[in-house]
Amino acid sequence: MSKEEFPSEKDLPQEDQEKQAKAAEADKAGVKDDKKVKDDKEEAAKPADVELDQLKAEVAALTQKNKDLEDKYLRSQAEIQNAQRRYSKERADLVKYESQRLGKDILSSVDNLERALQVKADDEASRQLKKGIEMTLEGLVRALKDNGIEEIKADGEKFDPTLHQAVQSVPAENDDQKGHVVQVLQKGYVYKDRTLRPAMVVVAQ
């Protein structure tokens, strides 16, 4: 086919040349518009990504804060429960051992009365006085027992460091006597399940 069959732009009429030029410009504009849309989308996506990262960071911070608050709450609850248990125990002990201090004060009077009874009564007046002391002592011992204070068994018993205080040791007369109390120098007392005063004893070794 010869060149005459395909006319160049110069050979086209002026009107057709203008149409082709406009079409070319439109194509270029379309490409630019597509690129602009793409760029706009990318720019719009960037703030969204930043905002998402910020939200994630805030959620993580709030989650940690909530965990810290929950831990503090649990610790506070545990401290409150421990305080309540201590308070309950102290009250129970106070009720249970309310006579302990009074018992200790009375024991010194019991010791004095027992020493007074060891004095020999030579006349009727002394015997009457001794009888009165015996009655007083019996009343005190009975009152102590009624309030949970009782004498510790010591003479002839196996030495028990929770109940007895060894102040002296002597040679044992036989093997069975070893480690046993052979003399009580001062009586000991227990108050319910507590040792109010250990017995002062001599132990055979």
UniProtKB/Swiss-Prot annotation:
UniProt cross-references to InterPro entries, sorted A to Z: GrpE, GrpE_coiled_coil, GrpE_head
Protein name in UniProt: Protein GrpE
Main subcellular localisation: cytoplasm
Protein role: Participates actively in the response to hyperosmotic and heat shock by preventing the aggregation of stress-denatured proteins, in association with DnaK and GrpE. It is the nucleotide exchange factor for DnaK and may function as a thermosensor. Unfolded proteins bind initially to DnaJ; upon interaction with the DnaJ-bound protein, DnaK hydrolyzes its bound ATP, resulting in the formation of a stable complex. GrpE releases ADP from DnaK; ATP binding to DnaK triggers the release of the substrate protein, thus completing the reaction cycle.
Start and end residues of each stretch annotated as Disordered: 1-49
SUPFAM superfamilies found in the cross-reference section: Coiled-coil domain of nucleotide exchange factor GrpE, Head domain of nucleotide exchange factor GrpE
Keyword Signal in record: no
CDD domains named among the record's database cross-references: GrpE
Pfam families: GrpE
Name of the gene encoding the protein in the UniProt record: grpE
PANTHER family: GRPE PROTEIN, GRPE PROTEIN HOMOLOG, MITOCHONDRIAL
Keyword 4Fe-4S: no
Subcellular location: Cytoplasm
Gene source species: Lactobacillus delbrueckii subsp. bulgaricus (strain ATCC BAA-365 / Lb-18)
